[in-house]
Amino acid sequence: MTNATDTNKTLGESMFAQCGYAQDAIDKRVSQVWHEIFEGPNKFYWENDEGLAYVMDTGNNDVRTEGMSYAMMIALQYDRKDVFDKLWGWVMRHMYMKDGHHAHYFAWSVAPDGTPNSNGPAPDGEEYFAMDLFLASRRWGDGEDIYEYSAWGREILRYCVHKGERYDGEPMWNPDNKLIKFIPETEWSDPSYHLPHFYEVFAEEADEEDRPFWHEAAAASRRYLQAACDERTGMNAEYADYDGKPHVDESNHWHFYSDAYRTAANIGLDAAWNGPQEVLCDRVAALQRFFLTHDRTSVYAIDGTAVDEVVLHPVGFLAATAQGALAAVHSAQPDAEHNAREWVRMLWNTPMRTGTRRYYDNFLYAFAMLALSGKYRYE
């Protein structure tokens, strides 16, 4: 059925097991995640008459590169090549832009019938697609045409790096500071887009000439995350300038809010794959400490000041912060290990979300369950 319940060739230790949960119970929870997203009455995965498939953002009633790339990663982790290929086929048919200013990027939002809602890309989709494809090639080998996974992964990254130089358009990474942009046209970032653990794989799989770039990008992102995450609270803004400070404009994305929750999870997975970074481990430990003693339903500025707004994705926030335990447990702060285990226990005791906002929350939940069970693999 699925390979995510196997224990061979995993990240290593399961934090769930370290917290005392039995392996059978862990495996059942991991299997439940697949059922909830892809099969059960609360699923948001759909197959169509073309033999392809998509996942829908149930809160916005559209199909996003974010969600499609997340679903592909989950299909890969569960060894479901059939689902992976149906999703990737839908992406290439309905999201891939063959011409125009953003040629070779993907339209970030599309209606379920394939009608584009936007002609612009969102870089978190492209970086996840590239990673999905490289890992698919490692696991299943390359096929033909769009299923020649590694070739497509290399193509995506080639345009991400070299647009504005050899190709029309703008790159998704600033060529000077090696930091990912919020969108190609902007010169600021989104801290939750920074995936140094992915860039280490890109440095092995991308075009030979670009591999040094990806090594540098991994190091640059780790430095950036240190700057973006507040030393006392561990929080980062949704949008941040290249110095890590919140990006303030009319869009009102300078608080610790929806996108921002993913940062702790990303730091945790990087620690699991590549070893802990002391400062980043301390940042996640600070985040976990703050939210064990403050109202978790409130939105905050990154300095810890409460904002008159309510968290939109409470389950996703909890799951991503719990995944950060993979880093926080390595912090030298005296309460870090205890707090990390408390977050893992809170996640274990929290069900997946139902209702219209379940899409984002349950994706973050799925990634956390895989990572904390030692089953989020990169080989």
Curated annotation (Swiss-Prot):
GO terms for biological process: xylan catabolic process. The keyword Hydrolase applies. Disulfide bonds: none annotated. SUPFAM superfamilies: Six-hairpin glycosidases. It is an enzyme of class 3 (hydrolase). Belongs to the glycosyl hydrolase 8 (cellulase D) family. Hydrolyzes xylooligosaccharides with a degree of polymerization of greater than or equal to 3, releasing xylose from the reducing end. Has low activity on birchwood xylan, oat spelt xylan and arabinoxylan. This is Reducing end xylose-releasing exo-oligoxylanase. It comes from Bifidobacterium adolescentis (strain ATCC 15703 / DSM 20083 / NCTC 11814 / E194a). The gene is xylA.
